Amino acid sequence: MSPNLNGPGGSDDSDRPDEPDDSDRPDESNSTGNPDTPDDRPNKTPDRPSDHPSSLLDQLRAILETLAEIEEDGHRQGHGRIDRGNAQIDYDYEVSFGLGPRSRRGKPSDEPRVEAPRTEGTDSQPEGEKSIHIETRETDDGERVVIADLPGVADDELDVTLDADESALELRTDEGIVGRVPLDQPDVEITDVRLRNQVLEIRLTRTNESNGSESK
């Protein structure tokens, strides 16, 4: 019988489980020697898009640059976007200048004159006369009513006459002729003239004198 060299209750080394070799353990350290720091850290700050302004100041700068570009054209429109954190603001803009390049090359008198077209029921004033708004209408009784806006005109400054040569009704003030209404019926007479609250109302009726003279 061989003696127990491990003492009482002992066990042989061959019965112990094999401990893992250090070479089999994963290397938790990175190249810098910090075991708790991963090699590649994610970039927590996303890149801001370069194609949109990053602040209101950048947007104002872009608008000023656009104004400089359209100085000769006189008009520009477009759209853009402002990024403010997680919010995005889309906008449209339109810029116009009141005077175009031709205003710098010539006087206002050199510009071509554009006359407004005549509309039915509204009589335009001849060139050189003060522009006022005049309307005419026919009543069921055959009367013709002329209504004119005369701001700043007093009753004693107004004179209404019939121009038989041109078959027109003339409105005159101390400044001259302010309106002329063509008449398609020359045989008319003024029956009533009223100026109330700077609104002139003239009533015209047709006369039968010419027809009566022809029948005799």
Curated annotation (Swiss-Prot):
Keywords: Gas vesicle. Pfam families: GvpH. InterPro entries: GvpH (IPR008633). Induction: Transcribed from early-log phase, decreases as cells enter stationary phase, probably as a long gvpF-gvpM RNA. Highly expressed in 25% salt, poorly expressed in 15% salt, no gas vesicles are formed at 15% salt. Residues 38-51, 73-84, 107-141 have a biased composition (Basic and acidic residues). Residues 1-141 are annotated as: Disordered. It comes from the Archaea. GO terms for cellular component: gas vesicle. Its main location: other. Proteins GvpF to GvpM might be involved in nucleating gas vesicle formation. A minor component of the gas vesicle. Gas vesicles are hollow, gas filled proteinaceous nanostructures found in some microorganisms. They allow positioning of halobacteria at the optimal depth for growth in the poorly aerated, shallow brine pools of their habitat. Encoded in a 14-gene locus called mc-vac. Belongs to the gas vesicle GvpH family. GvpF to GvpM interact with each other in vitro, and may form multi-subunit complex(es). Interacts with GvpC. Might interact with GvpA. This is Gas vesicle protein H. The lineage of its organism: Archaea, Methanobacteriati, Methanobacteriota, Stenosarchaea group, Halobacteria. The gene is gvpH.
